[in-house]
């Protein structure tokens, strides 16, 4: 009798968690759609004015744009939800473009001081970047330094980067799991489309909003230790499996649940 009662409770819990996973997936999927739409604004940027990229594999350049875009998220500026071509909120912010320029210059050996170069370019573009500069400059610099040191893997037969190998070299470069090393993997995967397969070994980025979302659901907070990231990955995978969705939809759903805008 007790076994039947426990089995019934287990089914109820699983049903409840599946419902939660579905809601997170729905919220996250819509948010990710907006992120992918925002990323398309890079098509308006004249790359020849930024750095010499002719010899760079297009997929590598695409990934570096994802790095710059995600570092731009540290500005904490809400993404535009309406497609207005003449609205400044719809155009690509000049700040991620500056991030990309500094990153490419650092990789090419043009500049040795990432922080000084970044501050110089932001200062030169003062009017355009007023109110849009990075609120977490040290985190931005750390992210730029990490990706300047990383040698991206060769493009695979499918025409895309191996996310698992890219994660490995990024974590080796920065020494441990960091948001600035993991968030670009998410943006790159999103711009590849819904059919892009994400390996289960990938660690979803976990900033303060995602951590708050996890705390609201499960009652405990996570930091950025390796064990916390692995626990977070397990939760993401379980919720994604329940909702038949990607970890990126769950990740953005948790971000929204935690108050991210």
Locations of regions flagged by a protein language model:
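HhH-family (HhH-GPD) DNA N-glycosylase catalytic core used in base-excision repair
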Residues: 1-261
């Amino acid at each position: 009798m007790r076994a039947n009662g426990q089995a019934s409770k287990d089914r109820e819990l699983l049903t409840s968690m599946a419902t939660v996973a579905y809601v997170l997936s729905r919220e996250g999927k819509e948010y990710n759609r907006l992120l992918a739409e925002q990323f398309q604004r890079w098509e308006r940027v004249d790359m020849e004015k930024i750095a010499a990229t002719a010899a760079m594999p297009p997929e590598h350049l695409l990934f570096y744009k994802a790095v710059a875009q995600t570092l731009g998220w540290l500005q904490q500026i809400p993404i535009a939800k309406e497609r207005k071509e003449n609205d400044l909120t719809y155009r690509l912010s000049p700040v991620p473009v500056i991030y990309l320029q500094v990153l490419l210059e650092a990789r090419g050996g043009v500049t040795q001081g990432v922080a000084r170069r970044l501050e110089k370019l932001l200062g030169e573009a003062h009017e355009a970047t007023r109110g849009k500069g990075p609120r977490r400059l040290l985190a931005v610099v750390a992210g730029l330094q990490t990706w300047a040191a990383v040698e991206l893997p060769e493009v695979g037969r499918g025409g895309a980067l191996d996310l698992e190998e890219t994660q490995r070299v990024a974590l080796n470069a920065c020494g441990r799991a960091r948001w600035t090393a993991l968030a670009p993997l998410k943006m790159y995967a999103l711009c590849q489309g819904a059919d892009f397969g994400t390996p289960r070994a990938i660690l979803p980025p976990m900033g303060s909003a995602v951590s708050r979302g996890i705390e609201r659901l499960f009652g405990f907070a996570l930091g950025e230790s390796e064990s916390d990231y692995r626990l977070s990955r397990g939760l993401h995978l379980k919720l994604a499996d329940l909702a038949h969705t990607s970890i990126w939809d769950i990740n953005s759903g948790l971000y929204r649940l935690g108050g991210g805008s």
